[in-house]
């Protein structure tokens, strides 16, 4: 059987290479967990039939769902395997079938097992977006359809504060937002407002349900507020996210780093145009306690990036273009040199995460697509990474997928539940046809159940006739919704019994390990260079090397995918 014929029947195997969408990125299957000649496949005349690939075992001893012959792309590897789901969690990665008659079976299929055909598909962990302004609930539909299954941030709707900052302020708003979370088929966590110089206003927000706290310059990110917020976080094992002081009113970047006192913090907008200390916020990438992320409007740097940012910034931060000081504030944040350096710092693993900044200078449905566009641009401009071979871009792919999966999960203390495809974790999985990888998922699974899929006319005789578009599936309806998605809170919240007090239906899961994670723990993205930014030219130098690149004029994963 030729390799081509085998791949068409059972999907790629060890040594086969797959192009990601229309990029120049190639991944190569490193290992095949299935056994040649013993593969399982569902369909008429196929293997998964009673007495053949399907065993006589009862429900307790078989998988609830098996994704057959899928290529897994995750931070830990690129492998071909069957994936078992049981009770909403990933149960195993291995070889599925009937252990009574087949060798090497690690996943039993029975009458209680549903099958999802993964032949020819790539499976990734559900994306995690940790920079959400909850301005409109419709963002969740867009995010979920793009492959994001967990959203962390703050807000209360299109309030002026939420339009600019990712904070859900105070116990009353926190209770209302947690109640609203019960209505959406996605994992959610809310950040309280961290801008206060005394502990009690912050502690009460964490008790009320906050997953962590957010410091934002628009509320006054002073050294005193930073110190107080991190002290409360240390006491409650929660994470702090920070948008630093663009105007350098409360101090320069050195004063902010000093206020951290070596404590762990997630720095939003560690990048070219999102805000923070101008012009040298990128310096914090070299700090061992700083977990840096950037947002997707500047990803990747293109010929259009600068032009779109000024108006975007004026709207999001409630600025008036007729006021000279407001205009100067906006222009200080948009620097081509630091945006270009951001591309390279992502490629070298100094910037550990990528998120959206939804409707507040960011596009909630484009975290994944812009991650892979950035990876493509860097390959075209900088060539293969030292860790990669001439045959594939496996390391680069692992580095970039980690930016929106495992590293955000580690940062916010939820990696014990989500962020990777590993046994025991919540079964949030995204299935992709390789030609549409990163652009349009084929199916999104939440908590082991199909939540969103590309579906044709519901009145048609088969599932595929036009119009085919994303439609919500049964995991988004009735009681299944609350049993297939999670709400993340602090242990303090859980101890306070807010689930019963608020009348919440979703399972509440406490975050953990938020205060011990460091830059060293950022998988494939742990580089800590010494960075300097010239205050006059904005040139960025990392470990003695000037970081600069040209803007892209053309990108993959773009117009050819969105003609209709």
UniProtKB/Swiss-Prot annotation:
Subcellular location: Cytoplasm
Chief location of this protein within or outside the cell: cytoplasm
Record GO biological process: urea catabolic process
One Pfam family here: Amidohydro_1
Annotated catalysed reactions: urea + 2 H2O + H(+) = hydrogencarbonate + 2 NH4(+)
Active site per the UniProt annotation: 317
GO molecular function: nickel cation binding; urease activity
Annotated positions binding substrate: 216
Cofactor(s) required for function per UniProt: Ni cation
Cofactor, free-text remark: Binds 2 nickel ions per subunit.
N6-carboxylysine: residues bearing it: 214
Subunit structure: Heterotrimer of UreA (gamma), UreB (beta) and UreC (alpha) subunits. Three heterotrimers associate to form the active enzyme.
Record-linked PANTHER family: UREASE (PTHR43440:SF1)
Protein name, UniProt field: Urease subunit alpha
Species whose genome carries this gene: Burkholderia thailandensis (strain ATCC 700388 / DSM 13276 / CCUG 48851 / CIP 106301 / E264)
Lineage summary: Bacteria, Pseudomonadati, Pseudomonadota, Betaproteobacteria, Burkholderiales
């Amino acid at each position: 059987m030729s390799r081509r014929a085998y791949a068409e029947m059972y999907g790629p195997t060890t040594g086969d290479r797959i192009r990601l969408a229309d990029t120049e990125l190639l991944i190569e299957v490193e290992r095949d967990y299935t056994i040649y000649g013993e593969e399982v496949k569902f369909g008429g005349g196929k293997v998964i039939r009673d007495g053949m690939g399907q065993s006589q075992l009862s429900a307790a001893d078989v998988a609830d769902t098996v994704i057959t012959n899928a290529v897994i792309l995750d931070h830990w590897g690129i492998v071909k395997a069957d994936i078992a789901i049981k009770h909403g969690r990933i149960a195993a990665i291995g070889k599925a079938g009937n252990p009574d008659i087949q060798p090497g079976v690690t996943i039993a299929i029975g009458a209680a097992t549903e099958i999802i055909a993964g032949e020819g598909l790539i499976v990734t962990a559900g994306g995690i977006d940790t920079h959400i302004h909850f301005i409109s609930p419709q963002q969740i539909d867009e995010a979920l359809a793009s492959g994001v299954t967990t959203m962390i941030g703050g807000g209360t709707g299109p309030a002026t504060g939420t339009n600019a900052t990712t904070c859900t302020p105070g116990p009353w708003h926190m209770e209302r937002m947690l109640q609203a979370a019960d209505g959406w088929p996605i994992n959610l966590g809310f950040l309280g407002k961290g801008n206060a110089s005394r502990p009690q206003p912050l502690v009460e927000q964490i008790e009320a349900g906050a997953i962590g706290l957010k410091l934002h310059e628009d509320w006054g990110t002073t050294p005193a507020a930073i110190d107080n917020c991190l002290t409360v976080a240390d006491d409650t094992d929660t994470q702090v996210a920070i948008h630093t002081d663009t105007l350098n009113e409360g101090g320069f970047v050195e004063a902010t780093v000093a206020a951290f006192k070596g404590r762990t913090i997630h720095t939003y907008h560690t990048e070219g145009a999102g805000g923070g200390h101008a012009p040298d916020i990128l310096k914090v990438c070299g700090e061992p306690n700083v977990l840096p992320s950037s947002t997707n409007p500047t990803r990747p740097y293109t010929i259009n990036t600068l032009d779109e940012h000024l108006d975007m910034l004026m709207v999001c931060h409630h600025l008036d273009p007729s006021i000279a000081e407001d205009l100067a504030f906006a222009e200080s944040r948009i620097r081509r040199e630091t945006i270009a350096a951001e591309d390279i710092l992502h490629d070298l693993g100094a910037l550990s995460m990528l998120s959206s900044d939804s409707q507040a200078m960011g596009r909630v449905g484009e975290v994944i697509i812009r991650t892979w566009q950035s990876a493509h641009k860097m390959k075209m401009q900088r060539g293969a990474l030292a860790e990669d071979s001439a045959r594939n871009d496996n390391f680069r792919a692992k580095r970039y997928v980690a930016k929106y999966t495992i590293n955000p999960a580690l940062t916010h203390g939820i990696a014990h539940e989500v962020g990777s495809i590993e046994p025991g974790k919540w079964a949030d999985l995204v299935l992709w046809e390789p030609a549409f990888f990163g652009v349009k998922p084929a199916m999104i699974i939440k908590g082991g159940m199909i939540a969103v899929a590309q579906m044709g006319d519901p009145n048609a005789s088969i599932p595929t006739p036009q119009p085919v578009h994303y439609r919500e599936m049964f995991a988004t309806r009735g009681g299944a919704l609350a049993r297939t998605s999670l709400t993340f809170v602090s242990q303090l919240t859980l101890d306070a019994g807010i689930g019963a007090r608020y009348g919440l239906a979703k399972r509440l899961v406490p975050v953990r390990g938020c205060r011990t994670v460091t830059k060293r723990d950022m998988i494939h993205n742990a580089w800590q260079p010494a960075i300097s930014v010239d205050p006059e030219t904005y040139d960025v130098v990392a470990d003695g090397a000037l970081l600069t690149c040209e803007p892209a004029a053309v990108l993959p994963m773009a117009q050819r995918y969105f003609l209709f």
